[in-house]
Amino acid sequence: IYAAAMQNCGALAEAAGVTPTILPVRALGLISGMFYTTKFDQIGLFLPRYLYGKGERRKAFKRYEKPDCPEIIKALPPCYLVTSKEDMLEHYTLQFAKALKENGMRFQLKDFRKDKKLTHAFSVFDPYLKESRETMNQMVHFFEKA
């Protein structure tokens, strides 16, 4: 999401110390997203230092570490989000969908029912499942309309 948001938010790109791609991003497909990397949980305890660096580099990007920051959300193209009740990161996807909704952004959320085979990123890890094919077909349709 950061790379896509940087196309429309120069301050974000500057804080990250990168030049945004000129390749236009019309929509995003986000499957079982690890959106929140600074929470006090298994992800947030170790990941931030690898993602954001230390010292001045970290300080410049600090305000953008949470993807539901309004400057990031409002800079995103339409988003198609996929999760499931068995996805260990379902709560991240639902929180991100809530932020998109609160900021009036166009998105579609597909949250699959509780089913042991529909685990984290099931549509990537097991693309031959009926639900995986359904996910990909709906995502393509969403992209075509973006």
For each feature predicted by the language model, list its residue ranges.
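Alpha/beta-hydrolase superfamily serine-hydrolase fold, recognizing
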Residues: 1-146
